[in-house]
C-alpha cells in the first residue's frame, strides 16, 4: 500500500492560521478589542518592514509566546482570532493602534519602553510606535 502526500494548496488559510496562532498565544484571546489591536499591530509591522504578516509572526525577537502549539483550533477564542486575522488580511480591519509596531503587557516594563510613551492601551497591553 502506498500513501500519497496531500499538499494544502490554500496558502491564504495556512497564513491566516499561522498568524492567528501567534495572536492567540500572545493575547490569550482576552477580548475582541485586544485581538483586533494586536492583529493591527502585526499589519503595521509588515507594512513598515515591507514584508508579509506571516514573516512578521515568525520573528522570535518580537513574539516570545509563539512556540505554544497547544491551541485547540475548534475553541471559540481561537476562532475569534482566525476571523479577525482573516478580516485584516482582506483589508477590512481598521488600525486601532494608530500605527503602533511595538507592544508589551502593562505588568512588564522592558528596557526599550522606559523612556517612551505608549499610544494605545487595550485591555492591559500597551502599544508603541
Task: Enumerate the language-model features and the residues they cover.
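Bacterial extracytoplasmic/cell-wall-associated proteins, especially those involved in peptidoglycan
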Residues: 3-129
Amino acid at each position: 500500500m502506498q500513501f500519497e502526500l496531500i499538499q494544502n494548496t490554500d496558502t491564504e488559510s495556512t497564513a491566516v492560521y499561522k498568524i492567528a496562532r501567534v495572536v492567540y498565544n500572545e493575547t490569550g484571546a482576552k477580548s475582541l478589542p485586544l485581538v483586533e489591536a494586536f492583529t493591527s499591530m502585526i499589519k503595521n509591522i509588515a507594512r513598515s518592514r515591507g514584508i508579509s504578516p506571516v514573516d512578521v509572526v515568525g520573528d522570535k525577537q518580537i513574539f516570545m509566546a509563539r512556540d505554544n502549539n497547544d491551541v485547540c483550533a475548534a475553541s471559540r477564542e481561537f476562532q475569534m482570532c482566525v476571523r479577525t486575522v482573516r478580516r485584516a488580511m482582506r483589508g477590512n480591519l481598521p488600525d486601532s493602534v494608530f500605527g503602533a509596531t511595538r507592544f508589551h503587557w502593562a505588568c512588564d516594563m522592558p528596557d526599550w519602553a522606559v523612556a517612551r510613551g505608549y499610544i494605545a492601551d487595550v485591555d492591559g497591553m500597551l502599544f508603541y510606535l
